[in-house]
Amino acid sequence: GRDGYIAQPENXVYXX
């Protein structure tokens, strides 16, 4: 979610 689209469930949502 650091970039707002990276496919990683870091914050429960991709970015979102």
From Swiss-Prot:
Molecular-function annotations in GO: sodium channel regulator activity; toxin activity
Keyword Transmembrane helix: no
GO terms under cellular component: extracellular region
Tissue: Expressed by the venom gland.
UniProt keywords, alphabetically: Ion channel impairing toxin, Neurotoxin, Secreted, Toxin, Voltage-gated sodium channel impairing toxin
Location in the cell: Secreted
Keyword Mitochondrion: no
Main location: secreted
Domain notes per entry: Has the structural arrangement of an alpha-helix connected to antiparallel beta-sheets by disulfide bonds (CS-alpha/beta).
Function field: Alpha toxins bind voltage-independently at site-3 of sodium channels (Nav) and inhibit the inactivation of the activated channels, thereby blocking neuronal transmission.
Family: Belongs to the long (4 C-C) scorpion toxin superfamily. Sodium channel inhibitor family. Alpha subfamily.
Protein name in the entry: Alpha-toxin
